[in-house]
Amino acid sequence: MKIIKRNGSEVDFDLNKIVVAVTKANAACEKQELTASQIQEIAEYVEFKTVKANRALSVEEIQDIVEDQIMAQGAFEVARRYVRYRYTRSLIRKANTTDNQILSLIECNNEEVKQENSNKNPTVNSVQRDYMAGEVSKDITKRILLPQDIVEAHEAGIIHFHDSDYFAQHMHNCDLVNLEDMLQNGTVISGTMIEKPHSFSTACNIATQIIAQVASSQYGGQSISLAHLAPFVQISREKIRASVQKEAEAFGATADQEQINKIAEERLRDEIRRGVQTIQYQVVTLLTTNGQAPFVTVFMYLGEAKNAQEKADLAMIIEETLRQRIQGVKNEKGVWITPAFPKLIYVLEEDNIHEGAPYWYLTELAAKCTAKRMVPDYISEKKMLEYKVDKNGEGHCYTCMGCRSFLTPYIDPKTNKPKYYGRFNQGVVTLNLVDIACSSGGDMDKFWKIFDERLELCYRALMCRHNRLKGTLSDAAPILWQYGALARLEKGEKIDKLLYGGYSTISLGYAGLYECTRYMTGKSHTDDEGGGKAFALSVMQHLNDACNKWKKQENIDFSIYGTPLESTTYKFAKCLQKRFGIIKGVTDKNYITNSYHVHVSEPIDAFTKLKFESEFQRLSPGGAISYVEVPNMQQNIPAVLQVMQYIYDNIMYAELNTKSDYCQCCGFDGEIKIVENADGKLIWQCPNCGNTDQDKMNVARRTCGYIGTQYWNQGRTQEIKDRVLHL
């Protein structure tokens, strides 16, 4: 049985320490109020509660239980002494708030840091440097930069102020990189002028350099479009044709144009293969200044091509990208595995969704890729054109920024044309809906009152995000603000104009709609007749109404965002259990449900789930993604295609979750299971050989839109274990 110390490290529970602490407090009293047997009884009760919690309790939680039990024994003077001791120790700890945290993460015994980010390896020096900087930033943020009530709400799990480890700096969240502008008009990387590339392979190489630079200048994800690389295929084609012509002439051969074109196309395909491979391998092997591979999404949308030739060339790039992802990348043992990045998004459209359509072959390839490697994810052009309508009444299809954060439609006042690439998100604050419900005690009037109070708190927290960016000079990140990734501002110019008028967005996240509804109505939000669904939709509308009010008030694009709780799901769950105890169906798990999702354990088929969630996705304009959990589908591609066609007709953005694991000890290639060890901790175990060494297995799971490969905290691991199949 483990407990979590204040520095995040995990240690064995020691009953004797409780006995010693209470005995000292008792001895300090003039009249000892507790007998040795009473002290032993207190310690044993704490041990019982710790076991019953079915998770590692924190030292603070254990001390709270000790206090309660001393009071229950009527030993009030002992309780006062114990509280005074805690307070004195707390003051000593606050004298330096970061030393223990930093030292524990350097020595790799900080359990919370180990499992905080499923794509960061905390044993690597570069990651540790990022975490060290993050601890300092979090400390400054808590003590100086944020109002105390926002800090307290964050620590209590009432809200989550995202990425406080980067808040000390003037950094934004995520964006759509304007790769087209940078490649066509040139850019500057690390003080070096980069001109328009003269081949597809060079364009791919430059793109990876841009990705790395952008990732090092922000804390969130980024997206690029393959359509911005497509024009360079024709440039390479013409170069290769000229080269083949020269070779023929040098040998005195007479080659007709058809032969030259055939040879050129073969060489061109080889260049496309090498270019795509450059992007894949550079992305997974690059380490940015925040200690991880860039969180990058590659967008594959035929509709972005400007002409027929460019569309055909884009199709070749998409085909090669899918083929290489199906193959995967080799791990250190030389075995092909599923890489986490880049994330791929494939747009379903009339030209590729029906059998017999011109690009149906790409959709079949995408289905095979999803069945084996969990990507691509799918955007329905049909539904997105319905959802994302600008002020002129025109619908648009575009990618999300990284995982799921979507921009709002925007017309550039300079050109009177829609603009998406070069825009960004300022940051996120997430509201814990479950806490609002539990705080209300089930009283509807009280619920809406507390809801409004919490929304006001979120508004002020979001304005802290906004104001932190306000006044930022373009010099803070030249690749972003001066050299085309997001803008081409002058040196020394402030970025303020990009923060207003809809150019960028700022996101109000939400989590736990299922548990909130369950507590307030006694029903799941999938329950149409019992009032669950109607209540859940009214909560969503209330969130949107708040954002619309703030938008008019501030001229800033506030939007609702279905938060991908990665490690925070565990934190929220622990905070809820601490504040409200174990409530069946509400706080009895070590996680809470992401955004509007159907609870992971609720039986529901794939099509019903997607149809149901589509209503809620539409009410999350700032971003959201739905998923269906499926078994190994590699031998049932027609079923995958059927789900994809359903996505096209019914929901804007969705993904299929499969399993893709490998045991390095025995070579097992299948699903590595989650089991409970002797301490009650969830661990990963090979079903073939029993291997439990995480360093000797490759596990890839969908964490929250992205694929995670570095394991997860106990809350998220339990959530993964509880997932039921939908197909």
Feature-to-residue mapping (PLM):
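Short, solvent-exposed positions on alpha-helices
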Residues: S37, L57-E60, S504, G530, ...
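Metallocofactor- and cofactor-centric catalytic cores in central/energy metabolism, strongly enriched
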Residues: I272-V276, Q280, Y519, R716-D722
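Contiguous, well-ordered alpha-helical segments that form the cores/surfaces of helical PPI scaffolds
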Residues: P231, M300, I506-Y519, Q541, ...
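Short amphipathic alpha-helical segments with coiled-coil-like heptad repeat character
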Residues: L15-V19, G74-E77, K306-L314, T521-T526, ...
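Long insertion/accessory domains within large nucleic-acid-processing enzymes
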Residues: N688-L727
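Conserved catalytic cores of very large enzyme subunits
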Residues: T88-I92, T98-G502, K523, E529-T692, ...
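Charged, amphipathic alpha-helical regulatory modules used
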Residues: M1-N109, K721-H726
